[in-house]
Amino acid sequence: MLPIVELFQNRKLTIYLPEGYYESEERYAVVYVQDDGDLIDPKDSDVLQKIRELTAANQLPGLLFVGIESFDRNDEYTPFISPNIFEPESGKQFGGNASVYADFLANELKPYIDSKYRTLPTREHTGIMGFSFGGLISVYSGLRYPDVFGRVGSFSGSFWFPGIVDWIEQLSIHDTGQRLYMNLGHAEGFGRTNGQQWMVPNSKRVYQYLLQNGFHEDSIRQVIYESNFHSFDLGVQYVPEALQWLFNEE
């Protein structure tokens, strides 16, 4: 089934409907995917096909995916204004507009999707996920709107970003029933001299804090795989099993 491409507030959306959507009246859980849906884009990997196979085998519920175009990920996916470490001599900054973008996701995009498609709108049926900065903004949005996004996936999330750990550690987190999946390579950022050197230690710190404050062992999972690189190709391989853990009730 080909994806549906449409515009919402001048932003491209790529909608991947579950198989059999038009042949039934069933309602489906929704997963909002950053970076134009790169984690499930058939051009980038075979992840979507694996998801379809798991669903056909009754190992994963049918899911509706919404790939969301970013106008500028360095602005929309970053929680705070900070020097752009990728262009240190340019004077450019990360825009720090994550709060505006998260509000758009929760209060504008989600109601639109729920009104147009047959969705299960409750938080336990609403997921959000992304890679790198996309993982960062997914966790940020999930923690900012726990009553909206009940299933959160971060693949090599950029927790090296200045201020994000402090922001998370000042939150008053309660047992919201959320599930949070995080993964990263065991040596991502090692040898770097910029802020990315904090990728692994900050990710572990976030996991431990959340585990001790509001989440339980059965509601948060961190997977650390063998890799020295910040690799999309490696991180994306874990998407099917992450979705199984996030959406299959144990």
Would you name each region that the model predicts?
Residues 1-250:
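Non-catalytic cap/lid and distal C-terminal segments of serine-dependent acyl enzymes
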